Amino acid sequence: MPVLHNRISNDALKARMLAETEPRTTISFYKYFTIVDPQSTRDALYQMFTSLNVFGRVYLAREGINAQISVPQSQVAAFREQLYAFDPALNGLRLNIALDDDGKSFWVLRMKVRERIVADGIDDPNFDASDVGEYLKAAEVNAMLDDPDAVFIDMRNHYEYEVGHFENALEIPADTFREQLPKAVEMMQEHRDKKIVMYCTGGIRCEKASAWMKHNGFNKVWHIEGGIIEYARKAREQGLPVRFIGKNFVFDERMGERISDEVIAHCHQCGAPCDSHTNCKNDGCHLLFIQCPACAEKFKGCCSELCCEESSLPEEEQRRRRAGRENGNKIFNKSRGRLNTQLGIPDPAE
């Protein structure tokens, strides 16, 4: 029987990855297309990825595939060839290559079947996800940024927007993509005559969001081809001004790709200029927040003195304390509300 799941501990896998000498390339891709049997497709892809020593995070659903992976450089060509041959819908698929890559983005392959590759909360049977807005390439993005009739909408999370975004882009104040979709429609009701440009990290969220806006009667809708990653790459290759300011947050060990030299965020503990995210070292917290080097030393990588004290306790006592708390999303979520409560940061909406 083929091995279809990882059987090695995370610590061992991470140590193995860190000991590797061959460089790796971080790649992301997505495709909306019909997968009749997501589970069997998942199992076949898992075997293929494993044979090429690919690490990463992959989600499959009946609506398509969403992947962020790390591929040994010697296997990139073979990976591309095998992926393109796997299904006609994947032939020629755009692969977003990381802009700022240390080759240590992932250390294990996790591949899961989900209801949706992006949790959108849409249950309207008349919604056509294939009726998307028009793509914009790098030069067209810059032209739109100079168009007074264009509004750029950032379809990412608050912690992504905080460290980097396009000039004058509109942030949708919500904690999840499913909450952002109706709010984007609501916020743009008075601007139906405007040109709407939607963007996200790699294109998967803004593509669906553009279809949702069209479904709700907006006719002038665009989205950035390949998201921030492809925009920045093409702008640099073509010698164009890069109009994205700051850092592009990514969902792997790097937690960010430097796009411009500007640091537009601040340490959540002391207020110093900083755009480096980290997770609280207290295993009972793991809050995602921005922490400067000085505060990292002062608080030992924790988000508060309380967490610092708790993380210094014997492991058995830490486990005992964690056992009495709620877990899952209620503790480990990345919501703005939890961040503000934990660190005493004023809510910008208030």
Swiss-Prot record:
The record's keywords, sorted A to Z, are: Oxidoreductase, tRNA processing
Composition bias of kind Basic and acidic residues appears in 316-328
List the protein's name.
Answer: tRNA uridine(34) hydroxylase
Could you say which protein family the record assigns here?
Answer: Belongs to the TrhO family.
Biological classification of the source: Bacteria, Pseudomonadati, Pseudomonadota, Gammaproteobacteria, Enterobacterales
What processes in GO biological process is this protein linked to?
tRNA modification
Query: Which Enzyme Commission number(s) are on file for it?
Result: 1.14.-.-
Catalysed reaction(s) here are: uridine(34) in tRNA + AH2 + O2 = 5-hydroxyuridine(34) in tRNA + A + H2O
* Domain (Rhodanese): residue spans on this chain: 146-240
Q: Please tell me the species this chain comes from.
A: Citrobacter koseri (strain ATCC BAA-895 / CDC 4225-83 / SGSC4696)
What job does the chain carry out? Answer: Catalyzes oxygen-dependent 5-hydroxyuridine (ho5U) modification at position 34 in tRNAs.
